Amino acid sequence: MADLSALKDIATTAEPAAPVHVKKVDAQGRSYATGKRKDAVARVWIKPGSGKITVNGKPFSDYFARPVLQMILQQPVVAAARDGQFDIDATVAGGGLSGQAGAVRHGISKALTYFEPGLRAVLKRGGFLTRDSRVVERKKYGRAKARRSFQFSKR
């Protein structure tokens, strides 16, 4: 019976298996995260503020002129009900505008979870924390594109 009591002691002193998310903030009070989408990589810093979003030193509405891309950028902040509460500064490189907008969105989502770990469930449910792994399929030899064959003439 002594063996069983030892097991009970181990079971009661064991730590919970679920990871505890801790707030990650630097000396300036900012949270940092990287986001990726297609060939674009974004580095994002967020801090409490008035809701100003800058991308590569420009206001996001100037950098991303299309309203669809602006909406993509704001999705995680709106979903977390933190609109106008954080200043967001992002630098993004590589890819096109659509990939860059997706990369910044991914970075904002991760930075929000580092700043407020309680938002993780909301953002994960919205699919903002998942890295979209779809990339362009490579071109194969003997074909016109990745899957398109050259035109075939029967005669």
Curated annotation (Swiss-Prot):
Pfam families: Ribosomal_S9 (PF00380). Gene3D superfamilies: 3.30.230.10. Disulfide bonds: none annotated. Coiled coil: none annotated. One of its GO terms (biological process) is translation. Keywords: Ribonucleoprotein, Ribosomal protein. One of its GO terms (molecular function) is RNA binding. InterPro entries: Ribosomal_Su5_D2-typ_SF (IPR020568), Ribosomal_uS9 (IPR000754), Ribosomal_uS9_bac/plastid (IPR023035), Ribosomal_uS9_CS (IPR020574), Ribsml_uS5_D2-typ_fold_subgr (IPR014721). GO terms for cellular component: cytosolic small ribosomal subunit. Belongs to the universal ribosomal protein uS9 family. This is Small ribosomal subunit protein uS9. It comes from Sinorhizobium medicae (strain WSM419) (Ensifer medicae). The gene is rpsI.
